[in-house]
């Protein structure tokens, strides 16, 4: 496979910086699943719906017939309006609140049950990467923030959604938690994030066993080096700033070294993350629970 590396940085704009890997897309062609309607007449909650993963997942669920409730700390009204316009026969709601607030999570899950009497799907995806620092320099405040969002918040959402899935008729549902390869590989300078994502993996396995009697499946994904987008850009920038892993402070060179760690010699794309998520949320994976899918290009 021919790999053509292009690294372009737009100065002083972290969210727009682009350290991109172009590759022969013929090796990565996707089957068109737009007409499969795997989620027709189902209801889903997507947390972190403003992020790359959350937004794309919401769009793909809607494309396959699902009604979607969007949860995020920031407003998702624009996404909701776009989905309503494109899929007028489905229902879409935008709920803006902090998943770390237990009372708010309970309130919004109860609203869903009182209005729709069902909830089939949860993409438990909201998260926070935190600082990129050596353990001895890492602040307690940021460590706590990472744990509050990635572990406590994710747990509260999982528990409350599972309660709906348990009491609805018929019982059951599918949940996918967003973990990370960081929770498996334990990278340096990411003590809070990596620890939190290791917790998410264990949470997934335990919840899958606890919830199986109610026909609720719980799985997780562990992505690594996914782009383009804010998270890829931020990771490259912070790796370069730290300088301790790749021994270089040039983001372009750091990006090249990061890609060289991947056996497939490229980063993954957002659709390559969400396709497995959709599989785990669908009836195609009806006998799969407690499983984590590594989406890493072979790392």
Can you name each region flagged by the protein language model?
Residues 136, 185-191, 213, 265, ...:
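Active-site loop immediately N-terminal to the catalytic Tyr-X3-Lys motif
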Residues 133-135, 139-144, 258:
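Substrate-binding pocket helix/loop in short-chain dehydrogenase/reductase
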Residues 158, 196, 204:
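Active-site helix of classical SDR
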């Amino acid at each position: 496979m021919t790999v053509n590396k292009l690294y372009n940085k737009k100065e002083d704009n972290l969210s727009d910086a682009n350290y991109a890997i172009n590759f022969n897309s013929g090796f990565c062609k996707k089957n068109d699943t737009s007409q499969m309607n795997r989620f027709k007449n189902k209801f889903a909650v997507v947390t972190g719906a403003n992020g790359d993963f959350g937004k794309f997942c919401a769009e793909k669920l809607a494309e396959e017939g699902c009604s979607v409730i969007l949860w995020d700390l920031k407003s998702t009204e624009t996404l909701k309006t776009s989905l309503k316009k494109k899929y007028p026969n489905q229902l879409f709601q935008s709920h803006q609140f902090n998943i770390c607030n237990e009372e708010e999570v309970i309130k919004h899950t109860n609203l869903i049950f009182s209005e729709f009497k069902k909830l089939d799907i949860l993409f438990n995806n909201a998260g926070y990467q935190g600082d990129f620092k050596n353990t001895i320099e890492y602040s307690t405040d940021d460590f706590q923030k990472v744990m509050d969002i990635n572990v406590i918040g994710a747990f509260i959402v999982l528990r409350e959604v599972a309660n709906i899935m348990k009491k609805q008729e018929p019982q059951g549902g599918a949940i996918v938690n967003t973990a990370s390869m960081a929770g498996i590989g334990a990278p340096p300078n990411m003590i809070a994030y990596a620890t939190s994502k290791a917790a998410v993996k264990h949470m997934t396995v335990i919840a899958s066993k606890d919830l199986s009697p109610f026909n609720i499946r719980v799985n997780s994904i562990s992505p690594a080096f996914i782009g383009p987008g804010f998270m890829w850009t931020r990771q490259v920038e912070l790796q370069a700033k730290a300088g301790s892993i790749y021994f270089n402070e040039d983001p372009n060179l750091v990006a090249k070294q990061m890609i060289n760690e991947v056996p497939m010699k490229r980063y993954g794309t957002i659709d390559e993350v969400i396709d497995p998520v959709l599989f785990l949320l669908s009836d195609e994976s009806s006998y799969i629970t407690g499983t984590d899918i590594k989406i890493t290009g072979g790392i």
